[in-house]
From Swiss-Prot:
Residues 30-140 form the sHSP domain. SUPFAM superfamilies: HSP20-like chaperones (SSF49764). The keyword Hydrolase does not apply. It comes from the Bacteria. GO terms for cellular component: cytoplasm. PROSITE patterns: SHSP. This is Small heat shock protein HspB. It comes from Bradyrhizobium diazoefficiens (strain JCM 10833 / BCRC 13528 / IAM 13628 / NBRC 14792 / USDA 110). Belongs to the small heat shock protein (HSP20) family.
Amino acid sequence: MRTTYDFAPLWRSTIGFDRLFDLVDAAQQAGTEDNYPPCNVERLSEDRYQISLAVAGFSADEIAITAEQSVLTVEGRKSEKQQREFLYQGISSRPFKRQFNLADYVQVKGASFDNGLLQIELVREIPEAMKPRRISISGSSASNVRQIDGKAA
């Protein structure tokens, strides 16, 4: 049994969280979509990630990887040159399209293809202007403070 949530009350009191609500809606509908090819998403360190897709039967030139704004898309399409007669076909060669939503400042650094495994490296690079910084406090120091002589009343 699936449960759906109504986010309408939150829309009235939040500003700028549109993308978050879209991601939650997409996650609720994720159970109905195809999960081919199988994949792993790993955190390698604080700011490094890796997506591994099992694409046995495909070659590197039959796979396209595109990063557009905050969405990473991996598409594969076999180029069948000759018809084969299979007695049993257990390795799928159907076309696929997998999309991954990327967080802010996450960029694709590279991809490699080896032994039927496509690995995509991701790095989160926060701009210097967005990183926390220490602010110095200016003003009078203890050496500049003068005490005024006062008489007790």
